[in-house]
């Protein structure tokens, strides 16, 4: 099982918009060295919405190859058409991912019945463990705990990434889904409390730029060391809001580039690079977190 501090990795790109595999390899090595517990490849932060299926699968496969068994890789397999999600799932099933992360279908706003049918179909297309992903702020559909509970009986659905920031859902999900169902926070600002309330891990945006500090916070929270968790959070919590001054992954990709971890900050349309007005704000937050900028 996958626990702890998990990075929602950015997908580095060359100036022409193609994937920068050299920088991708460097990012994988960086997170292994920093102690990150797992990597999500081509999720929301990895620009899954603008990578066609063939390229999407190729990026996940290369991430697995670069990791070479040293860190678990979770492949994003979400789409707003069930047939497309099944296609991605089948394509990712043979590349060596430890699990897959599937966001709720976005824009078309399925009912709970539709969500259950969608995830049932996706899970049936593979033996690889599946993690559900609820982020209504981006998808316009909220998968409530009672809907999640109806999917627990499917053997390869192992957990959910809950990104509403509503901490009351931790207890509700645990009560409805049982102790073995994995609960991951998808909201950096409430991640420490989420873990303290019984969560198992955090799939994080900020982890891209403060992996060591983020892991320290997660480890302390999971072990019940409230003081150490608060101390680790204090040094980086400013980033939890500043990294969302524009739509994710715009700010974090800019920050990763400023750290010299990727060759440039190219991001695919319709997203554009961080607006100049926010450069100072993000640089100040990075400075306060003692991040070296090149």
UniProtKB/Swiss-Prot annotation:
The active site is at 133 (proton donor/acceptor), 161 (schiff-base intermediate with substrate). GO terms for cellular component: cytosol. The gene is dapA. Belongs to the DapA family. Coiled coil: none annotated. This is 4-hydroxy-tetrahydrodipicolinate synthase. Homotetramer; dimer of dimers. GO terms for molecular function: 4-hydroxy-tetrahydrodipicolinate synthase activity. Pathway: Amino-acid biosynthesis; L-lysine biosynthesis via DAP pathway; (S)-tetrahydrodipicolinate from L-aspartate: step 3/4. The record marks 44, 107 as: Part of a proton relay during catalysis. It catalyses: L-aspartate 4-semialdehyde + pyruvate = (2S,4S)-4-hydroxy-2,3,4,5-tetrahydrodipicolinate + H2O + H(+). PANTHER family: 4-HYDROXY-2-OXOGLUTARATE ALDOLASE, MITOCHONDRIAL, DIHYDRODIPICOLINATE SYNTHASE. It comes from the Bacteria. It is an enzyme of class 4 (lyase). Catalyzes the condensation of (S)-aspartate-beta-semialdehyde [(S)-ASA] and pyruvate to 4-hydroxy-tetrahydrodipicolinate (HTPA). It is found in: Cytoplasm. One of its GO terms (biological process) is lysine biosynthetic process via diaminopimelate. Its EC number is 4.3.3.7. Keywords: Amino-acid biosynthesis, Cytoplasm, Diaminopimelate biosynthesis, Lyase, Lysine biosynthesis, Schiff base. Pyruvate binds at residues 45, 203. NCBIfam families: dapA. Signal peptide: none annotated. Its main location: cytoplasm. It holds the Pfam family DHDPS. The keyword Phosphoprotein does not apply.
